[in-house]
A protein has these predicted regions:
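Acidic/histidine-rich helix-loop elements
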Residues: 37-41, 69-84, 106-116, 142-146, ...
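Beta-strand-turn-beta hairpins that frame and shape the catalytic cleft
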Residues: 45, 54-66, 159-160, 167-179, ...
Length: 296
């Protein structure tokens, strides 16, 4: 039944895409040359830099710099290993204090690419060093591939996996917690309990694969980083996002969200799944400079 439903969903998405690209305003606005140019442009990664002032966070001498990569889907394109090396080089040049990986390292739908072993991916990611370390969670593709193999590969290369786990660290003599909420491997009740147990006073970064968990973030000095949606992966002019792949509200598909006095950032990720292309949603490296909110 699940396989049948996936096929039905895939036909619906393909149908919507076909109808969209054969009618105005899409066809009239871009034309054939513009269509190809936009596809080419949308495959090149961008560096997304943000400065966040978070209520309840320390007034550090300088902001805590966090680099965030998610949804690599290595193998969704034939040149992904070369691209991943270039991305790691670009992130290293930004000198992050902390590096976080949001899951879906492997790709289970390798149209035009191929399967890349987790150890190859982890070896490349391990070249990216940071004073506070590198930490990861798993995504749905990693669980389909085999969670144990992906975890072993990451941890073999010095990248701890925080699936349903917490890690404490210190930055400029202030404590910070890091909590991981994976895409699977835990019950919904366990995830609720993990989030409910966050300190109401201690600054916490919650690393989640799916932004749906932002709805359950308790009151406190916390912010969440998530992926999974690919920012929609395809955002057509005059039509918008074709598919979000999450039960989270559509407004949580991509970018910075501020609700209830708390922040969520949902990255568009790096790779693709399903169709091996992006449109209007380029892959991105996310770099956040975080600090305490200035008192007025």
């Amino acid at each position: 039944m699940q396989q049948y439903m996936r096929k039905v969903a895939g036909r619906r998405v393909r149908g919507r895409l076909t109808r969209a690209i054969t009618r105005p305003p899409f066809h009239d606005e871009l034309g054939r040359k513009g269509w190809l140019a936009e596809i080419s442009r949308a495959q090149r990664h961008v560096i997304r830099r943000l400065h966040l002032e978070i209520a309840g966070w320390p007034q550090w001498r300088r902001p805590l710099r966090v680099a965030f990569l998610s949804d690599l889907h290595t193998g969704s394109h034939s040149d992904d290993v070369v691209r991943l090396n270039a991305i790691v080089h670009d992130v290293a040049a930004l000198a992050p204090d902390l590096v976080l990986y949001g899951g879906d390292y492997v790709n289970m739908q390798p149209f035009g690419g191929g399967r890349v072993p987790p150890r190859t991916i982890a070896a490349i990611l391990s070249r990216l060093e940071a004073p506070l370390g590198r930490f990861a969670i798993l995504g749905n593709h990693d669980y389909v591939y085999g969670a144990r193999a992906v975890i072993d590969a990451l941890e073999h290369h010095g990248i701890p996996v925080l699936d349903h786990a917490r890690r404490s660290m210190r930055f400029q003599n202030h404590a910070i917690d890091l909590v991981g909420v994976p895409d699977a491997g835990m019950t919904r009740a366990e995830a609720y309990a993990l989030l409910a147990g966050l300190s109401a006073e201690r600054p916490t970064i919650v690393l989640a694969h799916d932004p749906v968990w932002f709805a359950h973030l308790p009151t406190g000095p916390h912010f969440m980083l998530a992926g999974h949606t690919h920012g929609g992966q395809i955002r057509l002019p005059g039509i918008g996002i074709i598919r979000t792949a999450t039960k989270a509200p559509r407004r949580w598909t991509h970018g910075l969200v501020e609700e209830r006095g708390q922040y969520l950032y949902v990255t568009s990720g790096i790779g693709t799944s399903g169709l091996p292309l992006r449109w209007g949603v380029p892959p991105e490296i996310v770099v956040l400079d975080t600090a305490g909110k200035q008192r007025t």
